[in-house]
Amino acid sequence: YGNPGSFHTIGLRPKRAIAKARELVRDLINAKQVKEIIFTGSGTESVNLAIKGITEKYDTGHIITSTIEHEAVTETLYYLEHTKGWDVTRVPVNKYGLVNPKDVEDAIRPDTKLVTIMYANNEIGTIQPIEQIGKICRKKKVLFHTDACQAGGVLDLNVENLKVDMMTLNGSKIYGPK
């Protein structure tokens, strides 16, 4: 293993590999710049970085999510509610596990800083209307994060089409390196 932060040959090889991987992911999701691609150790770490990264900018605020999110999201939001004073609205899903975009829109308040909705649910197979929710968030000027770990390699990941500000992917789902 070479340290990609080093300036010797053993370190330069992984540095180039990481740079190439960033370009590949940028192209896969249609991100504007490679600097928008951040690698973490897991999907959970990525979810935490996205959510906590936004909430660090503010003392408190409001976040919208659904009632069927992955524990990476629910535990992070529970922490923010109970230790940092954030208010979290959990929009319901219908009998098929779908979020109604209108419910998200109706839940947005002046202090809403973030909406975070899972793209695809691996337990029940639901694919959320991410593009519709993304359009609402853009219109209301609210940041939008989607946990797309289960969608990687299967569904459209174009962040411009989906109107997603932050997307969590997991390398194990898209043949990424460990």
Question: What is each of the regions a protein language model found here?
Answer:
Residues 1-178:
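Pyridoxal 5′-phosphate
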